[in-house]
Amino acid sequence: KTRLRDAMGIHSARRGYSKDGAYGEKDRESGRSMAIKYDDSALKTQLQPIARVHPETGRIALYVSPGYTLGIEGWPQDESEEMMMYLFQHQARPEFVYSHRWSTDMLLMWDNRCLIHAATGGYEGHRRLLHRITIAERC
């Protein structure tokens, strides 16, 4: 915890949204239902604190994601990769995971500032309708 308190994560959308990323041309050819446009801007990187304080609760949350966090600024690559793998495994431990079972007319809300989310299926054979609303503070 002490070592990560002021550490900055190197974030990029390249793993998902670059031409060769998970949602790039090969994924599109495989029949993905959503039209995702890849872009070279996905190759850019941005630094973000690894440990962030939630502005409402004051609680500290990890801000790392296997899809977006490439490493830790200023750390040797091997140490950075080892720590990233540890953090990814830590945040996916069963006591931190909520899995939802959908039913008709259900509404689910979450706070992206303190969790990661993923669609893991479970709706095969059913119509999937998603309305996304993003609420943000003005900067």
Ranges and model annotations:
Residues K1-L107, N112-C139:
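Non-heme Fe(II) oxygenase catalytic core, chiefly the N-lobe of the double-stranded beta-helix
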